[in-house]
């Protein structure tokens, strides 16, 4: 091997980020130098944004699923509550209609006993 032939020699202390892909090392990963200090690859912003995009794509799908389930449950509870209130209002309306009919009959026939106090209405 001659002194000018540098093929196959890695001239760097950043072994984890500078080795070529054919060397079987992971590329573009945060590694550490000989002293244990972190080495950030030159395209670290791309890696971070890609990782953030991946997290943003996976986390919302699970979060959205849970939020959707929670929303459906809350909506069903609200519907049940509204149905109960509607049933109660229908009962009250029926009672009021019956009372209105009684009042109409009482006004049409003045000599009918008043159901509230037992006296005759004249």
From Swiss-Prot:
Miscellaneous comment in the UniProt entry for this protein: This protein is only encoded by mastadenoviruses, and may therefore play a role in mammals tropism.
Organism of this sequence: Tree shrew adenovirus serotype 1
Keywords: Capsid decoration protein, Capsid protein, Coiled coil, Host nucleus, Host-virus interaction, Virion, Virus entry into host cell
GO cellular component, one term: viral capsid, decoration
Coiled-coil region: 72-106
TM spans (from-to): none
Its job: Structural component of the virion that acts as a cement protein on the capsid exterior and forms triskelion structures consisting of three molecules that stabilize three hexon trimers at the center of each icosahedral facet and fixes the peripentonal hexons. Dispensable for assembly. During virus entry, recruits the anterograde motor kinesin-1 to the capsid docked at the nuclear pore complex thereby subjecting the docked capsid to a pulling force.
InterPro entries in UniProt: Hexon_assoc_IX
Compartments it resides in: Virion; Host nucleus
Gene from which this protein is expressed: IX
Biological processes, Gene Ontology terms: symbiont entry into host cell
Protein name as it appears in the record: Hexon-interlacing protein
Organism classification: Viruses, Varidnaviria, Bamfordvirae, Preplasmiviricota, Tectiliviricetes
Main subcellular location of this protein, as a coarse class: virion
Entry comment, domain topic: Three N-terminal domains of hexon-interlacing protein form triskelions between hexon capsomers.
Subunit (UniProt): Homotrimer. Interacts with hexon protein; this interaction tethers the hexons together. Self-interacts with adjacent proteins. Interacts with kinesin light chain KLC1; this interaction leads to capsid disruption at the nuclear pore complex during virus entry into host cell.
GO terms for MF: hexon binding
Inducing or repressing factors: Expressed in the intermediate phase of the viral replicative cycle.
Signal peptide span: none
Family statement drawn from the similarity comment of this UniProt entry: Belongs to the adenoviridae hexon-interlacing protein family.
């Amino acid at each position: 091997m001659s002194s000018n032939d540098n093929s196959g020699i890695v001239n760097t202390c950043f072994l984890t980020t500078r080795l070529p892909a054919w060397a079987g090392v992971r590329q573009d990963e945060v590694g550490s130098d000989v002293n244990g200090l972190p080495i950030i690859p030159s395209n670290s912003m791309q890696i971070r944004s890609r990782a953030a995009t991946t997290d943003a794509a996976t986390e919302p799908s699970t979060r959205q699923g849970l939020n959707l389930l929670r929303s459906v449950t809350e909506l069903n509870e609200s519907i049940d509550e509204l149905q109960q209130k509607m049933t109660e209002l229908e009962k009250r309306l029926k009672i009021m209609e019956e009372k209105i009919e009684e009042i109409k009959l009482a006004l049409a026939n003045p000599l009918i006993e008043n159901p509230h106090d037992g006296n005759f209405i004249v």
